[in-house]
From Swiss-Prot:
Gene from which the chain derives: yraN
Disulfide bonds: none
PANTHER family referenced in this protein's UniProt entry, alphabetically: UPF0102 PROTEIN YRAN
Cited Pfam families: UPF0102
Gene3D superfamilies, A to Z: 3.40.1350.10
Organism: Salmonella typhimurium (strain LT2 / SGSC1412 / ATCC 700720)
Family from the record: Belongs to the UPF0102 family.
Stored InterPro entries: Restrct_endonuc-II-like, tRNA_endonuc-like_dom_sf, UPF0102_YraN-like
Protein name: UPF0102 protein YraN
CDD domains linked: PoNe_Nuclease (cd20736)
GO molecular function, one term: nucleic acid binding
Amino acid sequence: MAQIPARGDCSRQLTRKQAGDAWEAAARRWLESKGLRFIAANVRERGGEIDLIMRDGKTTVFVEVRYRRSGLYGGAAASVTRSKQHKLLHTARLWLARQNGSFDTVDCRFDVLAFTGNEIEWFRDAFNDHS
């Protein structure tokens, strides 16, 4: 298993952007250790950004990475609101179109990798375009 940054290593001494980049890099390493292949990071399309795009076999996986210091207020996973899900779906739709694909032609899913303190939770298929 990939080494997870210790509490404070990413979030206290670094800027918010640097901390986000560090957690996304940790997420990428962790997912690669689970057999997923890296496709892209920080993919920006009009109206949104996808943290990681990975491949799990033939499935394209859009990954939202979240970090919270503690589980108060629901922890990291709870911060992926319905509004955020819609933005991710929209961004993925645009990215797929640039790849000459769509939700109808490409097997894909949306995962959330949530770091709460030093704990990792991997929510496979956390939501979809039918949610």
